[in-house]
Swiss-Prot record:
Gene3D superfamilies, alphabetized: 1.10.287.3510
Gene that encodes the chain: nuoK
EC number: 7.1.1.-
Function as written in the Swiss-Prot or TrEMBL entry: NDH-1 shuttles electrons from NADH, via FMN and iron-sulfur (Fe-S) centers, to quinones in the respiratory chain. The immediate electron acceptor for the enzyme in this species is believed to be a menaquinone. Couples the redox reaction to proton translocation (for every two electrons transferred, four hydrogen ions are translocated across the cytoplasmic membrane), and thus conserves the redox energy in a proton gradient.
Compartments reported by the entry: Cell membrane
InterPro entries in UniProt: NADH_UbQ_OxRdtase_chain4L/K (IPR001133), NUOK/Mnh_C1-like (IPR039428)
GO terms under cellular component: NADH dehydrogenase complex; plasma membrane
Example of a GO MF term: NADH:ubiquinone reductase (non-electrogenic) activity
Keyword Nuclease set for record: no
Keyword presence, Metal-binding: no
Family in the record: Belongs to the complex I subunit 4L family.
Name this polypeptide is given: NADH-quinone oxidoreductase subunit K
Superkingdom per UniProt: Bacteria
Lineage start: Bacteria, Bacillati, Actinomycetota, Actinomycetes, Mycobacteriales
Length: 99
């Protein structure tokens, strides 16, 4: 497959994720869209690394996945806290976590 196709797919996935972040109000859906955007960036890194015969993009994508795993833990903990406090996963309720 042509590397341009992978870059087009990466841009498409990033656009879908950005639209989901901007248009959705459910925190879980927004969180999934952020993860989709991170995976799109990883695909672009790996594609550029393959195009230039360099491993730096693949290593950077690996470290991005490690950071994303830690982000999942923290993000889900915050979403669970919002749900326990407000019985809703709406993004609009996120500013209500103040004591």
């Amino acid at each position: 497959m042509n590397p341009a196709n992978y870059l087009f797919l990466s841009a498409l996935l990033f656009t879908i994720g950005a639209a989901g972040v901007l248009l959705r109000r459910n925190a879980i859906v927004v969180f999934m869209c952020i993860e989709l955007m991170l995976n799109a960036v990883n695909l672009a890194f790996v594609t550029f690394a393959r195009m230039h015969a360099n491993l730096d993009g693949q290593v950077f994508a690996f470290f991005t996945m490690v950071v994303a795993a830690a982000e999942v833990v923290v993000g889900l903990a915050i979403i669970m806290t919002i749900f326990r406090a407000r019985r809703s996963t709406s993004v609009d309720d996120a500013n209500l976590l103040k004591f």
